[in-house]
């Protein structure tokens, strides 16, 4: 699933392409996504200008004068800029057509979402998908004290607490495993047992890991590409544990282990990461 670095890389790539530009047509080839795309959405947006291209967690927010379009890339989606008139490929489900270019949503598994939140429904932050999201990892308030305050009453494993999204947003499966490795914390450790000092280390490593991923254009394991169609290179350059089960740890040489937590694969070094 595209995580914060992939979504932010996409946002940066499409921002200059669409912000301030008028959407000529929203073309929906397949409306059966995670939630059905409203049938009246093309009519609501055609001829309207995009005022802002923002992000909250893993959601892209396209701001119009009368509301906000919420776009989620799902498990396998990507949003890229293509030349006007370029023929669609299989699984190209939605086009945002501008005078000079087209944004195209490609989503083989159709777990993504294209939703509409009118201004008359209240602030976008109150939308049910956004209202309970945690703090952004690059927010100055995100530090060890914050993380400790969010973890201290949670009995679940620290990896699952990171994935929950209500303490900090945008840290998905890849970067949770990588951040915990860099922080030296066993992913099975109950969140409430993580000391304030270790929370400080973990907060630093979450930020550092995500910053490395942003600088690399995210990670491409299967389907993700950035707005220009380029794959991300974080996995090839930086990944220390993710999908490296049985291979030697880059620090100590101990074989990396794989386990399943909450139906998600977790990778860790049993020597470098302590409970």
Curated annotation (Swiss-Prot):
Entry keywords, A to Z: DNA damage, DNA repair, DNA-binding, Glycosidase, Hydrolase, Lyase, Metal-binding, Multifunctional enzyme, Zinc, Zinc-finger
Cofactor binding comment, as recorded: Binds 1 zinc ion per subunit.
Pfam families hit by this protein: Fapy_DNA_glyco (PF01149), H2TH (PF06831), zf-FPG_IleRS (PF06827)
Phylogenetic placement of the source organism: Bacteria, Pseudomonadati, Pseudomonadota, Betaproteobacteria, Burkholderiales
Disulfide links within the chain: none
SUPFAM superfamilies with a match to the protein in the record: Glucocorticoid receptor-like (DNA-binding domain) (SSF57716), N-terminal domain of MutM-like DNA repair proteins (SSF81624), S13-like H2TH domain (SSF46946)
GO-annotated molecular function: 8-oxo-7,8-dihydroguanine DNA N-glycosylase activity; class I DNA-(apurinic or apyrimidinic site) endonuclease activity; damaged DNA binding; zinc ion binding
Catalytic activity: Hydrolysis of DNA containing ring-opened 7-methylguanine residues, releasing 2,6-diamino-4-hydroxy-5-(N-methyl)formamidopyrimidine; 2'-deoxyribonucleotide-(2'-deoxyribose 5'-phosphate)-2'-deoxyribonucleotide-DNA = a 3'-end 2'-deoxyribonucleotide-(2,3-dehydro-2,3-deoxyribose 5'-phosphate)-DNA + a 5'-end 5'-phospho-2'-deoxyribonucleoside-DNA + H(+)
Catalytic residues of the enzyme: 2 (schiff-base intermediate with dna), 3 (proton donor), 58 (proton donor), 264 (proton donor)
ZnF FPG-type span: 240-274
UniProt xrefs under CDD domains: EcFpg-like_N
Function field: Involved in base excision repair of DNA damaged by oxidation or by mutagenic agents. Acts as a DNA glycosylase that recognizes and removes damaged bases. Has a preference for oxidized purines, such as 7,8-dihydro-8-oxoguanine (8-oxoG). Has AP (apurinic/apyrimidinic) lyase activity and introduces nicks in the DNA strand. Cleaves the DNA backbone by beta-delta elimination to generate a single-strand break at the site of the removed base with both 3'- and 5'-phosphates.
InterPro entries linked to this entry: DNA_glyclase/AP_lyase_DNA-bd, DNA_glyclase_Znf_dom_DNA_BS, Formamido-pyr_DNA_Glyclase, FPG_cat, MutM-like_N-ter, Ribosomal_uS13-like_H2TH, Znf_DNA_glyclase/AP_lyase, Znf_FPG/IleRS
PANTHER family xrefs: FORMAMIDOPYRIMIDINE-DNA GLYCOSYLASE
EC identifiers of the protein: 3.2.2.23, 4.2.99.18
A biological process term (GO) from this entry: base-excision repair
Name of the protein in its database record: Formamidopyrimidine-DNA glycosylase
Cofactor(s) required, per the database record: Zn(2+)
């Amino acid at each position: 699933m595209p995580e914060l670095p992939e979504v932010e890389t996409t946002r940066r790539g499409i921002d200059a392409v669409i912000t301030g530009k008028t959407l000529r047509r929203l073309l929906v080839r397949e409306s059966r996504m995670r939630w059905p795309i409203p049938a009246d959405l093309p009519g609501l947006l055609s001829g309207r200008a995009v005022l802002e291209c923002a992000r909250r967690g893993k959601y892209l927010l396209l701001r119009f004068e009368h509301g906000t379009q919420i776009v989620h890339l799902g498990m396998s989606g990507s949003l890229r800029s293509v030349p006007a008139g370029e023929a669609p490929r299989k699984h190209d489900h939605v086009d945002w057509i501008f005078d000079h270019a087209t944004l195209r949503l490609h989503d083989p598994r159709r777990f993504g979402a294209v939703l509409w939140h009118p201004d008359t429904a209240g602030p976008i932050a109150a939308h049910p998908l956004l209202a309970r999201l945690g703090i952004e990892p690059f927010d100055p308030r995100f530090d060890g004290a914050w993380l400790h305050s969010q973890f201290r009453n949670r009995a679940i494993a620290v990896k699952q607490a990171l994935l929950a999204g209500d303490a900090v947003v945008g840290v998905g499966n890849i970067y949770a495993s990588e951040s915990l490795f860099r922080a030296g914390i066993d992913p099975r450790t109950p969140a409430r047992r993580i000391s304030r000092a270790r929370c400080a280390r973990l907060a630093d490593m979450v930020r550092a890991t995500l910053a490395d991923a942003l600088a690399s254009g995210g990670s491409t394991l299967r389907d993700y590409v950035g707005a220009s169609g380029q794959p991300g290179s974080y996995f090839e350059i930086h990944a220390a544990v993710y999908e490296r089960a049985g291979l030697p740890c880059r620090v100590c040489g101990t074989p990396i282990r794989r386990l399943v937590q909450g139906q998600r694969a977790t990778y860790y070094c049993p020597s470098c990461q302590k409970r």
